[in-house]
């Protein structure tokens, strides 16, 4: 399960801002919002059939999307193992910052042309493991960097299907392990 807490609009967009939080409808009985269905289609390309359900809402913010997640895993796991695995993933940045404005500001001040290219920024103190099989937490989505990196990776995969991982390593110096 996950909840997408979306920004109202991008800071560069003059319209579309909302005055207060707005909840989204569940259009699918199986998936909830389209986000879980989109993720399910993506995972199916890797022959993974996951039980996903999502809800969505917009907030009156222009900074970053927030994702609340609740994952149930088959094998027992500890919080330390979750932290270690997240920290080992070069596309994941960890942070103690609990406001999107602070993470956005870090990206503006230190990121490549003001952008964070990591796929996600996990807020460490929100991570929780319950009953050794349920992982819960929050993460922020660096929207611009996320779409830029995904587009580059997709292009490289199309051009170099057997070597795209090697090709995108030139960007690794632009990823952050800690924000």
Ranges and model annotations:
Residues 1:
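A contiguous active-site-proximal alpha/beta segment in oxidoreductase catalytic domains
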